[in-house]
Regions:
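Non-heme di-metal
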Residues: 1-172
Length: 172
């Protein structure tokens, strides 16, 4: 069974039971990238040509996605990882957590490169009511995932796990 508490018997990668999870992991590894390998000169040139409304949109996106990446990372680490038994799923989730951290580094790289007020960009998600409400909604389920130990072996525990998983993923 895929969902449940991992045991010592669940720590062997081979034989692989969930080939799809291992395939996702291998694909994720092949898609590895690093923010500082991306030259932003053309983007900076485009920035200079943007209208104030276009610049506002970029700032708004930066403000939304930067904290969102950390929320997703925490959700995976504390809300999913402990409740999936298969080591091939753990491989993929570990790589996905790395990707979320890499996205944070990418946003930081953009904030350092572009003429943006970093403090203002970091605070927008707390000041815009719709962003704040969305974040509060997600955090409610993230807390459920991280502050309580789900009785994952029970039907109710599995339902709660799936509910939390859907709530944090659909909204994000």
């Amino acid at each position: 069974m895929l969902i449940g508490k991992a045991s010592p018997e669940d720590m062997n990668l081979h034989p692989i039971r969930y080939q799809w999870a291992y395939d996702l992991y291998q694909q994720a590894v092949r898609n590895t990238w690093f923010p500082h390998e991306i030259a932003l000169k053309e983007d900076l040139d485009d920035w200079a040509k943007m209208t104030e409304d276009e610049r506002h949109a970029v700032k708004f996106l930066m403000a939304f996605f930067n904290p969102a990446e950390l929320i997703v990372n925490r959700s995976i680490a504390l809300g999913w990882y402990p409740y999936l038994k298969a080591p091939e799923c753990h491989l993929y989730l570990a790589k996905q957590m790395w990707e979320e951290a890499n996205h944070c580094v990418a946003f930081e790289y953009v904030l350092q490169t572009f003429p943006l007020d970093r403090e203002k960009a970091f605070n927008i998600h707390l000041e815009v009511p719709s962003m704040k409400a969305k974040e509060e909604y997600i955090i409610k389920y993230l807390k459920r995932m991280t502050e309580m130990i789900l009785p994952i072996e029970t039907v109710e525990g599995k339902k709660d796990f799936i509910r939390n998983l859907i709530a944090t993923n659909i909204v994000m």
